[in-house]
């Protein structure tokens, strides 16, 4: 043994060829601070080892290295710039030490080599993998950029254009893609990887392969003429700015770093990369996006724990109520390996549900994400039926019939009498209280809400609603089933609107009050989209949701929370509903809709809307961007905080993920609680107080007043780390 540490070891294989194996005791290998320090010492040991002729990097896991340890990021990023720069300089020196070994080096991969894992293999002279190999640099998705030499080495290995595409998109290349661009030198059968690696390094050591030429290319300036460089970088900056937009600086910063470093040798180029990395790491966007990643891991951890705690796994399921929603739920269940019965009283609805599942599978087939054989298997695992025969075999039943409490209660009561005592019943409802539906059941402990969002196959969030009598076993089983379906389940306690709809309607309330006071809805949409970062402004969102749906839900919320969500007189939602302007579904709402060449709805402004709004709005008045944002967002933020205060949702992490996954809250802001931390709770309280005369929706919750007085924040705990 040449060197051994907790997460890696080095030994000689044969004829002076050594193997450095990453072998962390955890389930995956990560380049955390401890592993980097061990790698540095291992390379010193290799440099001192007599008779060394070559080095092969390997991993004892199914994935090579999944990247740096992101749990350390926020703590590191909170350090002063000089300390962060010093940490990066140390990391860079390690990979340069690997690259400068006086012998040929090769990375032998299976599975993922991502982020720091990719940057590690870029420091070696050769790279081979099996067909499971996936190599990429996802850092820009976290609001940062490669900082271990990825922006320096990747362009020199595969060319600037291909490198910028991978880096700016946070893309991972499959083995065949990596081979095509030159990121992999060969794809080898898994059982022949080691033999192939030894042969390649032996050939290089015997000067049959020019490893030194490869190394020189990586450590020199990019071989681009001035004209080529100008065309390449100008085009890349234009495309990236258009795609990423102004709220996500990481992609464009990475292009600028590659451009600035293009004419420098490796060490000078690494200095340039490091400067830009530090700038991004200190940004609020990076803090928010890294925080979201950590929150997502937290949600996955809760789901994993629920699965382990449940006494029974879901092997079969049933969906009651077909159509688009039922078909989407059945598709998602079958796609992830849980056979499902889809029951409806109408043949036409069953056909609609099966057509929805078939359409979604055909899309995957056309994109090469599954083959015809697998598609047929998935489709055959959905059993459409007009009868209940076979429903007793289901472990979990999802009721997805029409949004009517009497109909839902009747269906749930009926099916409860046909299934075993340990079968779990759920209701896919967006507005009907779970405690109300539970009254129709003999075993309410086996019942909870399971609120899917439309379209089911795209929306990652599922709200799991705990009723007054719901058992922990029921929650665990349904959370585990939702996770098995590939969804992000978040448990909330029962209340009108649950969590997502409860916090959405104060947002619509703030919007309606702005309209009442004379604001232009098209300007509000532009400000909320372009300045705050929502995918669509409130008027456009109401059109997509449907003004009829919003009108009904608004009445439910007003009944549940009359002080904050009740209103005097009619508002814009009422006016459009009465005028039968329901939005996209019937071609006219706040905007008018037509179908474009691709068959997608295209919105335009029509003055036909103005007389309808005139009845519920005052004389036109101009509001500045900041006022618009504050008046629309304060009611939502307050309601989110009240949900935490009341225990409707358990943690800031779960709330922020629900907002991003369920409503499209701008990811670069990280969710309401991350946003409050970034602006400062004290600052928010002072700002919100200036609007309190607008009504109860604008009253600051006691929790925020208390935290502001103590100088607290919601995410203090995520900063813990040390250099």
Swiss-Prot record:
Residues engaged in binding NAD(+): 325, 344, 401-403, 408, 430, 454
Marked site (Important for catalytic activity) residue numbers: 119, 139
Region (Enoyl-CoA hydratase/isomerase): 1-189
SUPFAM superfamilies linked to this entry: 6-phosphogluconate dehydrogenase C-terminal domain-like, ClpP/crotonase, NAD(P)-binding Rossmann-fold domains
Region described as 3-hydroxyacyl-CoA dehydrogenase: 311-723
Annotated substrate binding sites: 296, 501, 661
Pfam families found in the cross-reference section: 3HCDH, 3HCDH_N, ECH_1
Stated family: In the N-terminal section; belongs to the enoyl-CoA hydratase/isomerase family. In the C-terminal section; belongs to the 3-hydroxyacyl-CoA dehydrogenase family.
UniProt-recorded name of the protein: Fatty acid oxidation complex subunit alpha
Organism name: Vibrio atlanticus (strain LGP32)
Phylogenetic lineage: Bacteria, Pseudomonadati, Pseudomonadota, Gammaproteobacteria, Vibrionales
Gene: fadB
């Amino acid at each position: 043994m040449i060197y051994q540490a907790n997460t890696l070891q080095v030994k000689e294989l044969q004829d002076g060829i050594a193997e450095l194996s990453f072998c962390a005791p955890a389930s995956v290998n990560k380049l955390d601070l401890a592993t980097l320090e061990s790698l540095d010492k291992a390379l010193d040991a290799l440099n001192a080892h007599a008779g060394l002729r070559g080095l092969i990097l390997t991993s004892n896991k199914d994935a090579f290295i999944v990247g740096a340890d992101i749990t350390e990021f926020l703590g590191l990023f909170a350090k002063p710039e000089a300390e962060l720069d010093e940490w990066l300089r140390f990391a860079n020196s390690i990979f340069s030490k690997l690259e400068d070994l006086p012998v040929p080096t090769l990375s032998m991969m299976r599975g993922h080599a991502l982020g720091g894992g990719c940057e590690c293999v870029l420091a070696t002279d050769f790279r081979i993998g099996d067909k499971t190999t996936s190599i990429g640099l996802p850092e820009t998705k976290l609001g940062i950029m490669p900082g271990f030499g990825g922006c320096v080495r990747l362009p020199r290995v595969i060319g600037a254009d291909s490198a910028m595409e991978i880096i700016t998109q946070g893309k991972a290349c499959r083995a065949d893609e990596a081979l095509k661009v030159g990121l992999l030198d060969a794809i080898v059968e898994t059982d022949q990887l080691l033999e192939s690696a030894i042969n390649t390094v032996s050939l290089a050591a015997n000067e049959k392969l020019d490893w030194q030429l490869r190394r020189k290319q990586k450590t020199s300036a990019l071989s681009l003429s001035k004209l080529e460089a100008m065309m390449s970088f100008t085009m890349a900056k234009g495309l990236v700015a258009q795609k990423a937009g102004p709220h996500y600086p990481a992609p464009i910063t990475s292009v600028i770093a590659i451009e600035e470093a293009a004419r420098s040798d490796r060490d000078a180029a690494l200095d340039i990369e490091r400067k830009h990395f530090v700038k991004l790491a200190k940004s609020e966007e990076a803090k928010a996006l890294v925080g979201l990643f950590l929150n997502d891991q937290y949600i996955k951890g809760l789901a994993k724990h629920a699965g382990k705690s449940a006494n029974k796994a879901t092997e079969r399921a049933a969906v009651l109520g077909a159509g688009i929603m039922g078909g989407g739920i059945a598709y998602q269940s079958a796609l992830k390996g849980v056979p499902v019965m889809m029951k409806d009283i109408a043949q036409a609805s069953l056909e609609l549900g099966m057509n929805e599942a078939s359409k979604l599978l055909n899309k995957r087939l056309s994109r090469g994400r599954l083959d015809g054989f697998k598609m047929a298997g998935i489709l055959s695992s959905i059993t459409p039926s007009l009868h209940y025969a076979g429903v007793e075999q289901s472990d979990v039943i999802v009721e997805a019939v029409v949004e009517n409490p009497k109909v839902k209660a009747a269906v749930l009561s009926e099916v409860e009498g046909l299934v075993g005592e340990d079968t779990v019943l759920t209701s896919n409802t967006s507005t009907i209280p779970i405690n109300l539906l539970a009254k129709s059941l003999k075993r309410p402990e086996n019942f909870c809400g399971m609120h899917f969002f439309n379209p089911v196959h795209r929306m990652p969030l599922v709200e799991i609603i705990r009723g007054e009598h719901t058992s922990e076993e029921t929650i665990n089983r349904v959370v585990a089933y939702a996770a098995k379906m590939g969804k992000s389940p978040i448990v909330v306690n029962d209340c009108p609107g649950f969590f997502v709809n409860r916090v959405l309607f104060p947002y619509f309330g703030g919007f309606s009050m702005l309209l009442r006071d004379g604001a232009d809805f098209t300007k509000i949409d532009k400000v909320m989209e372009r300045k705050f970062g929502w995918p669509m402004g409130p008027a456009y969102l109401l059109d997509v949701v449907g003004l009829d749906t919003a009108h009904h839900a608004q009445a439910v919320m007003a009944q549940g929370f009359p002080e904050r969500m009740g209103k005097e007189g009619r508002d814009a939602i009422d006016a459009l509903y009465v005028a039968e302007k329901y939005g996209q579904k019937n071609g006219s709402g706040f905007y008018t809709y037509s179908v474009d060449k691709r068959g997608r709805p295209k919105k335009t402004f029509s003055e036909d809307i103005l007389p309808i709004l005139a009845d519920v709005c005052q004389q036109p008045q101009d509001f500045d961007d900041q006022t618009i944002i504050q008046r629309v967002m304060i009611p939502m933020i307050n309601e989110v905080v009240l949900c935490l205060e009341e225990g409707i949702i358990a943690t800031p992490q779960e709330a922020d993920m629900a907002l991003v996954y369920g409503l499209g809250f701008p990811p670069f802001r990280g969710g309401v609680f991350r946003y409050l931390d970034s602006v400062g709770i004290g600052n928010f309280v002072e700002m919100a107080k200036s609007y309190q005369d607008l009504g109860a929706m604008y009253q600051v919750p006691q929790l925020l007043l208390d935290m502001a007085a103590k100088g607290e924040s919601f995410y203090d705990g995520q900063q813990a780390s040390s250099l």
